[in-house]
Amino acid sequence: MSEKKGALKVIPSASEEQLVQALGDLLQRCSQEALAKHDKFSVGLSGGSLVQLLTKALKSCNLKTAKWVFFFCDERYVRLDDSDSTYGAYRAEWLTQLPCIQESQFVRADTSQPLDACAADYEAKVKSQVDRFDLLLLGMGPDGHTCSLFPEQPATLQETKRLVIPIRNSPKPPPERITFTLPLINKARNVAFVVTGAAKASVVKSVFVDLDKKFPAAWVNPTKGQLTLIVDAGAGKEIETLK
């Protein structure tokens, strides 16, 4: 059974340039709103294609980022210098190309700890700095997963107390991870999915039009926040009714 989502804002992009501009505009708006109310702008990052897209957005937009703090919506349980590390991917891109970003602005997971302790420690770090995230930037896989919430592991969607949980036997390598849970995600002021590629067109429709709950991304519904979907022409080709 589908449940009605709150207001969804869809931003279609005909080109990568338009998508990067939309991402930059989103960052600017959310940053201005956050810094008008408190002394920092809290952002949750996701990996994959978002790393490059965000790098391009920040390079093309003249944004003041000194008061931005970056967390990770999920992280692979690997060494921070491993090629699979989401933190490592951002560090490699941003610290070499974006002089406005400092390493101290990243709040990273301590993957040297046992997996359960790593998740609990990261939850404590989140709680100590953030009540509600100002912006979470999420991707979505062709299987409808987001963060490290996978359709093959539906029990993760039922978590009600913990904000960060360990993941074992992930269907997508590497097998061990930590991830934000729905209570934390759905409390955010702004949640934005950034989805590209025609291979994801069908699941975009299933999640955002049909609200099919067999896909974890369909459970994302910020109850007191704004949900935004930024799509390129390929990913958005089956959702004309939402545009």
From Swiss-Prot:
InterPro entries: 6-phosphogluconolactonase_DevB, Glc/Gal-6P_isomerase, NagB/RpiA_transferase-like, PGLS. Keywords: Hydrolase. It catalyses: 6-phospho-D-glucono-1,5-lactone + H2O = 6-phospho-D-gluconate + H(+). This is Probable 6-phosphogluconolactonase. Pathway: Carbohydrate degradation; pentose phosphate pathway; D-ribulose 5-phosphate from D-glucose 6-phosphate (oxidative stage): step 2/3. Hydrolysis of 6-phosphogluconolactone to 6-phosphogluconate. Its EC number is 3.1.1.31. GO terms for molecular function: 6-phosphogluconolactonase activity.
